[in-house]
Each structure stands twice: as structure tokens, then as C-alpha cells.
Design a protein with these regions (language model features):
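Intrinsically disordered, low-complexity terminal regions
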Residues: 1-40, 45, 57, 93, ...
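Thr-biased low-complexity repeat/linker tracts and other Thr-enriched repetitive architectures
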Residues: 56-134
Length: 211
């Protein structure tokens, strides 16, 4: 898969993207060089991963979508939704006008804020608090150093399911608003995958075969 790399020359003095707009919907990976601050796009719809290196963040007037992961050295912000087939990780905050959805984990050095729901296939971790207009759900743990809010939408009266926080376990944080439902962590499957064995003086790494 092809990787496009954006540098300072692709942005104007206001950090707005001025390059080829075909990159906004690109069938490949997108990388943004370090130390650019928060760079701004109309939207991003990337087939592969999006990576903004150290001290670079991403802001989109509309949505941000990646078939794989989204990672930024600083913040990630979208006027509508943020969606990744894999994980979403930001050195500072993650904020979306609509929902935030990740196939694996969501991790922010600061806060996580969504106008609608927050959903992760793995865990959710925030250096500050977590705020969602609707539900928060993940399969593993939720960790927050501060408070957690779910169901803060102002465009309707939230139903019970709109303010439910579903997770395997609440590892840290205070539920300030919302209904916590801890469903238990999935059992760890015993596997030899990745283990190193030595046979006749030679080392081999085991790989589990799919049935």
C-alpha cells in the first residue's frame, strides 16, 4: 500500500492543507511530519493508517476515517465523526462533534470528548476525563484519571441505553453521569503463539495455525 508523506510545504501559514485534494480520499497510508502543530483538513478518508508524528496534530472540519489506525503526536479533532478500523491514539486530546469509533483501543494523553457515542473494540484510556453525548462502550477496561460522563446530549432526552457505560471493568475514574455496566473481562485464551522454543540448539518462534 502506497504511503503519502506531508511536510510543511503542504500547508499554508494557518496550517491549512493546500496540497492535492486527492489525498483527502486516498487508497493508501498518510503520514504527517513532526513538529507542524495542529494541521487542518476539510476531511480525511484514508484506506490505510493515518500517522501524525511527534508534535503534530490533526483537525478536520468534517470527519476523519481510516481503514487501519489513527495516531497523532498531539491532538485529533473532527467536526463530525472519527472512525478507525484499528486503534486511535493521541498525545493530547481526542474530540469529535459526532461519535468516536475504533476497532481496537482508544487512548488519549488528555481528554476524550464526543458529541455522540464512544465505542472501542478493546479498552479506552484518558489522561483527563471522558465525555460522551451518548453511550460509552468497550470490551476491556475504561481508565480515566478524572471524571466520566455519558448521555450528555442536549438535542433529546436520553434514554437509559443512551447514558449506559458498558465495559469489561472500570479500572479508574469517577462516573459523574451515566449508568455503569461492568460485564467482566473476557477469559484469556491459553496459546503458544509467539513463544520461543529451542530445538537442537536453534531457537524458533511458534505461530498458532488457524483451524
Amino acid at each position: 500500500m502506497e504511503t503519502k508523506k506531508l511536510t510543511k510545504k503542504d500547508f499554508n501559514d494557518h496550517n491549512e492543507f493546500i496540497g492535492d485534494e486527492s489525498i483527502l480520499s486516498f487508497n493508501g497510508n498518510l503520514e504527517i511530519e513532526e513538529s507542524l502543530g495542529c494541521v487542518k483538513f476539510k476531511w480525511l478518508n484514508i484506506k490505510g493508517y493515518i500517522l501524525a508524528k511527534a508534535f503534530s496534530g490533526i483537525k478536520a472540519g468534517e470527519g476523519i476515517k481510516a481503514g487501519e489506525g489513527i495516531e497523532a503526536g498531539s491532538g485529533i479533532e473532527a467536526g463530525s465523526g472519527i472512525k478507525a478500523g484499528e486503534g486511535i491514539k493521541a498525545g493530547s486530546g481526542i474530540e469529535a462533534g459526532w461519535g468516536i469509533e475504533a476497532g481496537s483501543g482508544i487512548k488519549a494523553g488528555e481528554g476524550i470528548k464526543a458529541g455522540e457515542g464512544i465505542e472501542a473494540g478493546w479498552g479506552i484510556e484518558a489522561g483527563w476525563g471522558i465525555e460522551a453525548g451518548l453511550y460509552i462502550t468497550c470490551k476491556l477496561t475504561i481508565s480515566s484519571k478524572l471524571r466520566i460522563f455519558a448521555g450528555l446530549c442536549i438535542w433529546k432526552i436520553p434514554k437509559e441505553e443512551d447514558k449506559t457505560i458498558i465495559c469489561g471493568k472500570l479500572a479508574s475514574g469517577t462516573i459523574e453521569y451515566g449508568i455503569l455496566n461492568e460485564v467482566g473481562l473476557p477469559e484469556k485464551k491459553e496459546t503458544c503463539d509467539g513463544k520461543i522454543v529451542e530445538i537442537e540448539g536453534k531457537k524458533y518462534q511458534l505461530k498458532e495455525q488457524e483451524k
